[in-house]
């Protein structure tokens, strides 16, 4: 009797690690990843973890991610307006979610970001002192 295997993927963590890995491999030739290609790579990477020799069978891949923010914000230093719904990150993530939905045995589970408490975080203390 075969063992059914479910795979859980932390979407944002996977994407960051994957892009970091690609940047190290390609160096200066790195280009932003096509969302369709990224969806394909996520699916195939998960399938590589199914061990057919141990009689494992894929039940489902659960891809957990958040919807990107559509909020309008201001840069902390210049107070210049920024519409997050028009950013390239927003478009890439929405497109990725659309491609992931079409993959067999893959379930997209969307959380949400609290738009009311979303704010800029400047981790570099030197830049923080310069800004404020």
Feature names for model-found ranges:
Residues 1-132:
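Domain-level signal for Mg2+-assisted phosphodiester chemistry and nucleotide/NA-binding surfaces
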